Amino acid sequence: MVKECTLTGKKSNNGYTVSHSHIRTKKIQHINLQTKKIWSDKQKRWIKIKICTKAIKSLHKLKV
């Protein structure tokens, strides 16, 4: 199962952990996924989706 936001399509990012002696080791920066229930007027029921917190903030801003 891919850690991906269903609304924005965001995925994990590759990066490096850099030590004091500048030795770089790879790491994965995961997105902050949350399970959220959203009311669908079209289907007249709650839909459970996994979305990132940036998408949740946008939904609150749009008052959805």
Curated annotation (Swiss-Prot):
Protein name per its UniProtKB record: Large ribosomal subunit protein bL28c
NCBIfam families in the record: L28 (TIGR00009)
UniProt KW keywords: Chloroplast, Plastid, Ribonucleoprotein, Ribosomal protein
GO biological processes: translation
GO molecular function: structural constituent of ribosome
Family affiliation: Belongs to the bacterial ribosomal protein bL28 family.
Organism: Gracilaria tenuistipitata var. liui (Red alga)
Source superkingdom: Eukaryota
UniProt subcellular location: Plastid, Chloroplast
The keyword Chloroplast belongs to this UniProt entry's keyword annotation: yes
Main location: plastid
Cellular-component GO terms for this entry: chloroplast; ribonucleoprotein complex; ribosome
Record keyword Nucleotide-binding present: no
